[in-house]
């Protein structure tokens, strides 16, 4: 039984989630059953809060509690200024009308035992998945009681960890997906599901061989870490803890967390947090704390989340004096908000910069090479911003250099930061089918000719951040496509898929080895 309501603590994400709901079952607290058979939980809430809540064995729409007349039961109260015990009685999970539908689900033996299974329902559009009940090894069950009186034919599918767009029953996607449905009836129904394979999941007991040269032990202070993708979803919350354990098991010592605010308009420029799209403060704090509990250092790298192509967004702005003042004000608010969160959470480093703010640098350029029109006061803005970050954050500050874009025009204010975070976007080869030796030679040349020179000139330590695609042609940054090649700037996007590109894991391994 879960307690779901109008607060974040009760699963309300204040977001436009699938199916038009704002709540997530996986984020709502689960009640514990006592020896007396009663269910309970404890919450810490601010006095005076207006609280609406209900009990559910679903998400508050599916399998919510119902009153004696069959209507949804919604409870409310004002949180008092002292500890209070609230005793409620649940009348029924059923509404009037159709009878329950029971699902009995078998999943493959290869399903990771630390994962859980979800059921996604589609009465008029896919809704957020609901975690279901494990009743045996690789066997799960769920009984759907209500609101059968409000729906007609309902499609359903099974997935792992609420990720039904990717970690779903393989039969439910593809060119000829199997679409299973049921229609509420006055007779109870039993549905048996056997998942043979999970989509995009090919576990193997055999290790994947990676041929590489001997690795010498690095000196103290060497950083080896993982940067987390900046796209997110509230349902990922349950994966934070196991993800940090996996990163620790890779022998990493650093995690780079990338919270975002969304850029929703360019005239005027609007930068604000969008629930359901951007990482919210409680989630950022939880992620950092999970990483620190594994002994990992944490760097916070706030990023902008553009609704359109970043180059098109900048080109479409009026970029007059008032426009720039608004942009600097709102960007500063975003960065300083994240610096405060980083300090409160115990992060050790804070990173600013990157590809998506290049036009706002002194003497800035748009992505087509034309002048951005940034005011002469831009240098002062960045100097002030770094000083303001230091007034809120006690850790180190890094500047993200988007290599090779304008890396040779380092702004003067970079002298104020402690180290460089070099985002590698340079191709490793000029040909479509290079070997690893050729790529290694090119990497060495670029490191010596560019990165080392920049590092020496600025007298700053640096961390090299690389992200290589698992696609044919990635080494030359010309991913094979029907009409030539696709060029992807990994500093501008966290991931990219294209139906015409060809997966090439061997090329990806060779790039990392180089």
Annotated model-derived regions:
Residues 233-248, 328-341, 404-413, 510-514:
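Short, acidic/polar
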Residues 1-50, 56-79, 106-151, 161-183:
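Aromatic-rich carbohydrate-binding modules that target alpha-glucans
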Residues 203-247:
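Boundary/entry segment of secreted carbohydrate-active catalytic domains
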Residues 2, 224-228, 253-259, 299-302, ...:
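Structural recognition of the beta-strand scaffold that forms the well-ordered cores
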Residues 209-218, 250-270, 282-367:
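Substrate-binding cleft and catalytic face of glycoside hydrolase catalytic domains
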Residues 82-115, 184-217:
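Compositionally biased low-complexity segments at domain edges in trafficked proteins
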Residues 279-281, 286-287, 293-297, 301, ...:
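Glycoside hydrolase catalytic-domain groove-lining segments
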Residues 265-273, 318-322, 366-372, 433-439, ...:
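A solvent-exposed, charged loop/short amphipathic helix patch at secondary-structure junctions
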């Amino acid at each position: 039984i879960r307690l779901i309501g109008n607060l974040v603590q009760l699963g309300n994400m204040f977001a436009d989630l699938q199916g038009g709901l704002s709540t997530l079952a996986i984020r709502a607290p689960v009640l514990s059953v006592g020896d007396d058979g009663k269910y309970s939980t404890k919450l810490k809430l601010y006095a005076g809060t207006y609280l609406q809540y209900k009990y559910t064995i679903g998400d508050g729409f599916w399998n919510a509690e119902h009153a004696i007349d069959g209507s949804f039961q919604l409870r409310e109260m004002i949180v008092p200024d002292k500890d209070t015990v609230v005793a409620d009685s649940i009348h029924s999970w059923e509404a009037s009308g159709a009878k329950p539908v029971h699902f009995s689900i078998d999943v493959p033996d290869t399903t990771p035992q630390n994962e859980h299974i979800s059921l996604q329902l589609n009465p008029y559009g896919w809704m957020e998945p609901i975690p279901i009940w494990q009743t045996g090894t690789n066997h799960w069950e769920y009984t759907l009681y209500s609101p059968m009186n409000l729906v007609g034919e309902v499609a359903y599918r099974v997935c792992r960890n609420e990720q039904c767009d990717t970690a779903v029953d393989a039969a439910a996607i593809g060119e000829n997906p199997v679409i299973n449905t049921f229609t509420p009836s006055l007779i109870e129904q039993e549905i048996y599901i056997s998942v043979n394979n999970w989509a995009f999941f090919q576990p193997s007991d055999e290790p994947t061989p990676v041929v590489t040269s001997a690795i010498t032990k690095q000196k103290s202070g060497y950083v080896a870490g993982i940067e987390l993708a900046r796209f997110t979803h509230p349902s990922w919350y349950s994966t934070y803890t196991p993800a940090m354990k996996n990163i620790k098991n890779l022998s990493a010592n650093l995690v780079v967390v990338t919270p975002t605010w969304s850029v929703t308009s360019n005239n005027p420029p609007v930068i604000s947090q969008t629930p359901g799209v951007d990482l919210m403060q409680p989630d950022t704090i939880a992620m950092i704390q999970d990483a620190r509990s594994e002994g990992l250092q944490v760097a916070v790298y706030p990023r902008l989340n553009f609704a359109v192509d970043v180059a098109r967004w900048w080109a479409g702005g009026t970029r007059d004096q008032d426009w720039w003042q608004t942009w600097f004000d709102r960007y500063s608010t975003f960065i300083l908000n994240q610096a405060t969160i980083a300090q409160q959470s115990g992060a050790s480093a804070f990173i600013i910069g990157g590809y998506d703010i290049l036009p706002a640098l002194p003497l800035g350029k748009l992505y087509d090479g034309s002048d951005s029109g940034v005011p002469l006061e831009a240098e002062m803005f960045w100097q002030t911003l770094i000083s303001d970050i230091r007034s809120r954050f006690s850790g180190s500050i890094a500047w993200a250099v988007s290599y090779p874009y304008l890396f040779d025009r380092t702004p003067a204010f970079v002298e104020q930061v402690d180290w460089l975070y070099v985002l590698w976007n340079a191709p490793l080869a000029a040909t479509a089918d290079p070997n690893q030796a050729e790529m290694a030679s090119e990497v060495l040349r670029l490191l010596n000719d560019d990165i080392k020179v920049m590092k020496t000139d600025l007298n700053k330590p640096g961390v090299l951040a690389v992200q290589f695609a698992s696609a044919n042609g990635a080494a030359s940054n010309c991913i094979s496509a029907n009409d030539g090649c696709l060029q992807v700037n990994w500093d501008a996007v966290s991931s990219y898929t294209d139906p015409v590109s060809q997966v090439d894991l061997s090329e990806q391994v060779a790039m990392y080895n180089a």
